[in-house]
Amino acid sequence: TEGLILLNHGVFSFGNTARLAYSRMINLVDTAEQYLVNHNAWDVERSLNKVPTKSMHIAVAQLRKGISLVVGSPVLLNITNSERGIDFSNRSDVAEIATRGPVTPDHVIRTKRIPMIGRDVEKFEQEYISYFKTNEPNAKERKTMLDAAPRVILDKEFGLCAVGKNMSEIGIISDLYEHTIECIHRAEKMGGWQVL
């Protein structure tokens, strides 16, 4: 056995040495990448959407304040200004595909389960609390709800935004969600985005 592919999750490679396992990983990833290219799912087309402007400062400050109140302490809000984030935020189906869940369960540690679509912080907070109250009783061990504020925002005007206590945290969240966007785009081209 050279490797293992877990549906909707990832690739694992094996070998008697680290070098052999790594070589097999490269071969498996190259094969997968070529498959995506051959099925027109590698290159993601993007439209040219306008990046955020300075006139949005008040709206950004109000949004950051609303999120800070839910967190219970001041947070930073960063508009990534990435073409990928703006384009994805302006998809007609963004509310449906972006809220199916994370690429991998461990992303929720940084990004929360789903992004906030638009700027309705109160709605996101209520839905987060409701989700927790519905699902916590089913957990094997008791869970403590963290703050109900978003960490990722997808907004038609702002594009992709990340929320965190410092720029290091925001950078990690932004990177994770930029990767998530690429995964969703490619999966949609291959028959539909699904989470584990």
Regions found by a protein language model. Give the residues of each.
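Active-site histidine-anchored catalytic micro-motif
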Residues: 1-3
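Histidine-centered catalytic micro-motifs
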Residues: 5-11, 109, 158
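Short acidic/polar capping segments at secondary-structure boundaries
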Residues: 10-12, 17-20
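Domain-length cofactor-binding catalytic modules of enzymes
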Residues: 16, 23-196
